[in-house]
Structures are given as structure tokens and as C-alpha cells.
Amino acid sequence: MTAIRKGVLSFAALMIVLFGTQISTAFAQMPKIKVGRTLGGSGFHIPSYIAVDKGLFKAEGLDADFIAAQAGVLVRAALAKEIEFVPIPGGGSEAMLKGAPLVFIVGESLVSQWTITTTPDIKRVEDLRGKTIGLERPGQAAYTEAVVVLGKFFKMEPGKDYKVITFNAEPDRVAALINKSVQGAILSFPHAARAEKEGMKILLKTGDYIPRLGGTFIAHKDLVKEKRDVTKRFIRAMVKANDYVKANKKGTIDVIQKYFEIKDAALAEGIYNQVQNAFGPEIPPDLLKELFESRTTPELGWPAGKPLPDIEQFVVRDLLNETLKEMGRTPKK
């Protein structure tokens, strides 16, 4: 090997090392953020799965890690500043009404994806009287959704008209349905589709009864104030992730298969078809109002006749709209 060739190879090797070092240094300097997600896959959270798996957070200069826990635990972690961004609008709004310093920053699902799915012998909602329904724990989104719909529209109360067994994760509720440990369960679209394939029946969609923000991210007020740029980057990544769902069917199906542990491509495609138009970064004022009103019912202990406070105080709408405008979008009203 000639001296010139050796020199060229040595220079090339040096450049590779230097370039690799620069990349490692840049990655190490990325702000680290923790992003909450619920146990088991959730149809409401598909854009956040995409933002992590497809590198959208990294593209915005954020080093993101998922933290999986129960919904209530995630809200408390956001309040304690242990997790920066948490997609729990139901529990978050309840905490805000009690004075928690939390705010909504960016949306995910703009429609309810909850169903009450039953064993095939249940023909109508009234057939659930005297039966056992699998729910989340009281105060969590799926519990509230089921109790409000059954109470408000069918005059059925937990403990009086039907029994309740609580489960931390949706896959456990699917298994209980299949094993006939329960006759009904609150399931999001993806898990309901899985149960339906096993012979179960989607009895009702709660979105037909109450509007729903789902997966809307909350953060501590101090984080938004002290790390405005980080919050803005997070919003940008989520805007792109919401767009990705509509624009990239195959990539989204891959993510669905991973997070819902689905090997059946046809089932994953069916889930995609259910949710492909469900997402958007906006937090529409009418849906926000419906969210808070659904948390101020007698079933949840809200005093009768007590009015809602000004709920716009619970949204950093200026930052969200500013980010959307910078991305060439007109914020929806």
C-alpha cells in the first residue's frame, strides 16, 4: 500500500471518528424528556407512539423516553414534575378543577374511541343489569366514560344496577370478556376490535353519547413557563405525528402492531381504518367544554348547580396557536 493511499485512508478514518463524535455529542446535548403512556396500547395515544418510533421527537431535538403507568399515576407524576408530558385529559381536567397547576398543551384524538363491548348474549344495554362489567379504577378515563354514559343515558348505577371489576390494563379486560369473567367491558377501538375477532360484540360507542378529547397532553405550568422552547418542540413533533397517521398507512400499522402486540396484519389494518381520521393537534373549545362538563356531574361528586370556572385558563392556547401558525397552519376555532 502506497504512502499516499495510507494517508487517504487515515484521513477518512479520522473524519469518520470526528463525525461520529459530533453526532454523539449533539445527541447527548438533546434535552431529555419523559413522556407518559398507559399500560397496554391505547388508540388515543397512537400519534405519541409514532413520534417516538419514527424519530419525530429526535427531529425536533428531543431525547424522549416513554414511562408506562396507570392513568392516575401519570397525572400525579406530572403534578410532581417527574414526567414532563402526560396524555391523560380526563384525570388531568379533574385535577385542574381541584386546583392542580396543570395545563393542556396539544391534542391527539378528537373523537371518543371508547366502547362498551360485551359477550354475544348481551343484545341491548339494559341486558347488562345484574351483570358484571370490567372497568378501570374510579377516577380514570375509561371508568368515568362508562359510568357517565350508563348513568346519564340508561339510568344504571355501578353497584346498584351492575357489578364492577377493575382492571389496570385493557388486555386484561379483553381476556376477562373472552373467559366470561365479565359480561361487559370498557375498551378502546383497538382492543374492541381484538375482542370482536374473538366473538365478542361492540354494544355501543360512547362517542355517540358524549363528545371526547382523547390523549390530549398535559404538562405542569412551571415546565411550560421555564422550558417554553422544549414545550414548543414537543408540540411540533406531535403536530407532525398526527399528520403521519393520515399520510402513512403502512408506517402507522407497523406502530399499531408493535404497541398492541398484534401479529395479524388484517386486524391491525382494521384498527387503522377505525382511527385514521381521529387525530388532530387542536384543542377545540367546544370539546374542551364538553370534557370539563363530563367531569362535573353528580356521578363524580360535583356539587349540583356549581358552575364551571373559566376553562380557557387550563390551556396554553397562545403557545399552541403560535406553533401552528409557524408551521403554516390556521388554528381551528
Go through each PLM region and give its residues.
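Short, glycine-/small- and polar/acidic-enriched structural segments
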Residues: 28-167, 173-179, 183-189, 202-206, ...
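Sec-dependent N-terminal signal peptides
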Residues: 6-15
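Ligand-binding clefts/hinges and TM-proximal coupling segments of bilobed small-molecule sensing domains
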Residues: 141-160, 237-267, 309-312, 323
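Pocket-lining segment of extracytoplasmic ligand-binding domains
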Residues: 90-92, 160, 169-260
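N-terminal secretory signal peptides that target proteins for export/translocation
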Residues: 1-5
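C-terminal segment of classical bacterial N-terminal signal peptides
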Residues: 17-26
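Secondary-structure end/capping motifs
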Residues: 225-304
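Conserved C-terminal helix/tail region of periplasmic/extracytoplasmic solute-binding proteins
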Residues: 296-333
